[in-house]
Structures are given as structure tokens and as C-alpha cells.
Amino acid sequence: MASQLTDAFARKFYYLRLSITDVCNFRCTYCLPDGYKPSGVTNKGFLTVDEIRRVTRAFASLGTEKVRLTGGEPSLRRDFTDIIAAVRENDAIRQIAVTTNGYRLERDVANWRDAGLTGINVSVDSLDARQFHAITGQDKFNQVMAGIDAAFEAGFEKVKVNTVLMRDVNHHQLDTFLNWIQHRPIQLRFIELMETGEGIELFRKHHISGQVLRDELLRRGWIHQLRQRSDGPAQVFCHPDYAGEIGLIMPYEKDFCATCNRLRVSSIGKLHLCLFGEGGVNLRDLLEDDTQQQALEARISAALREKKQTHFLHQNNTGITQNLSYIGG
């Protein structure tokens, strides 16, 4: 095995977020309010199963322990189960997760688990069916809820739910969410609304700091848990009276980037050192053949020397991220 991926600031990288498509069938107000618009990349232009196998093999050799499959909506790929199985071939990768809108969860989650999936994140921004429809553009609330139930029935001991925190939309619904997770092993993760190139006005109107929720959780006796090295950026809180947990992802908080442990590869094979960074390092020309793995690992390691210490969101610099479907949020 090559040496562990480490940047100039001594941060070690155990976590790969791999986008496999930028296509999505939902029209979430904070991501794709006008729906998916092809950018010239057809379905045939996204990474193939073999390319995914090669890129995850290289990252596994460089110390990656966790891979999250993202999009767009990853389950829209017909070969999604094959993709899970391809990542699963790497013994060094202990966790394989997906972030999904839940559209196909009820139908397919058992097959995904059989293929090797170990974790699920489902996007649910409201527990009110009408508001869910208004936010996502899809009247699929009951279908998504049934999918979460199906995940538990398939054997997943915990399901993570992502909720984008928005002022005057859902920030006042904490009690509703807490009631939902009281007897369910769900880690509900409130994610601060982030500014993107296409979402400046939405951000100005609806952004609210997760600090508001954190203060309220602490007031109610919730306890801050320690992070594991391959965990994502959430600050996780537990309470003895609840089966579920609360996570807070606050990218505008001081020192948010200090614990960064993740890298991103887009659905067309570009390595992104930060969700809000500029450009990207092309890897695709080194994904054509198994014999290129050493060169691929070298390019990944070399690119890491250019990773910045922090993002520049506080300066209203969102980098290349025009919307969150592009490199998987």
C-alpha cells in the first residue's frame, strides 16, 4: 500500500465522496429549482463501472476507508447495484454509503445491501407532505418514508437523514423532527444552507446558523459525541431518552475545515480537493487500464499538495460549485 493521503496541513484523508451522475429527478429549491439541465454530458459520459473500480482501488491503496456514492441521484443509474459491488471489491474500504433522495429506496434497498452497501443517507427537508412537495418539486413524501422503513427491514441498523436548514421553512420544526427520531435509530443531520453560484438569493433569504439549534439541543440536555477519523463533518449529539441522534453540519463555523478528511471525484472523473474549490484535477485518462494504477495514485497524491487550508465561503467565493448536484454536495 502507498502512504496515507496527507496534505500540507497534516490532515489525513480517509473518506472519498464519489459522484456517479449529476442527473436528478427532484427539483429541490436549494439545488436544482429549475430541474436537471444536461451540460453536454450524456449518460454514457459518466464514469463506467470499470472506471469506478479503478479509481476506488487507487484511493483504497492510498488509505481510503469510506466511500460515499453521490449524485445527482445515484440510484437513477441502472448499473447502481453493480457499482456498489465494484467498490466492495476493495477490502480496505470498510464503509460504502449512498446519499439518495429515497425515490427508489423501497424497491431496491435490499439489493443494495446484498451488493455491499453499509450506510444510507436520505434527504428529507420536511416531515409535512405538502411542504416536502413544495421543496422538492415531487409529491413523493410517503414513498420516501416507506423507503426509510424498508431500509430498516433490509437490515440497516441506522439510517441518516439529511435536512437542509432554512429560515422560515423548517428551522422552527425542531420538535417535530425530535418526535420522529425519539423511537427510531435515525441520525437526523441539519445542514446549513450553503451559498452556491446559482443560489445567492436563496441563501440571503433563508440561511440561518446551526448554532441556533446547537444552543437549543445543549439546553435540552443533548450530549456532543466524539468524531471517528472517517466520519463526515457533522457534530453529532445524543440524548438518553432518544433512539435517534442529531447531527449539525455548519460550514460557516470557525475551524470547520480543520478536521477535513474527505476528497471528491466528480461523475466525469475530476478530483476536487474542496466542495467549494476551483477547477479540478482530471483523472480519467488514467482510468482506462488496470496497468495505470501507480500513475493514478501518484497524480492523486501530487494534487493534494495544492489543497487549501480553508474554503472561502466567508468571502462569498463559492468556487466552481454552481449547484450541489455537480460534484455531489
Swiss-Prot record:
[4Fe-4S] cluster 2 binds at C257, C260, C274. Its EC number is 4.1.99.22. [4Fe-4S] cluster 1 binds at C24, C28, C31. This is GTP 3',8-cyclase. Monomer and homodimer. It comes from Escherichia coli O7:K1 (strain IAI39 / ExPEC). Catalyzes the cyclization of GTP to (8S)-3',8-cyclo-7,8-dihydroguanosine 5'-triphosphate. Its cofactor is [4Fe-4S] cluster. The gene is moaA. GTP binds at R17, R68, T99, K160, R262, L263, R264. The lineage of its organism: Bacteria, Pseudomonadati, Pseudomonadota, Gammaproteobacteria, Enterobacterales. Residues 8-234 form the Radical SAM core domain. It catalyses: GTP + AH2 + S-adenosyl-L-methionine = (8S)-3',8-cyclo-7,8-dihydroguanosine 5'-triphosphate + 5'-deoxyadenosine + L-methionine + A + H(+). Binds 2 [4Fe-4S] clusters. Binds 1 [4Fe-4S] cluster coordinated with 3 cysteines and an exchangeable S-adenosyl-L-methionine and 1 [4Fe-4S] cluster coordinated with 3 cysteines and the GTP-derived substrate. Keywords: 4Fe-4S, GTP-binding, Iron, Iron-sulfur, Lyase, Metal-binding, Molybdenum cofactor biosynthesis, Nucleotide-binding, S-adenosyl-L-methionine.
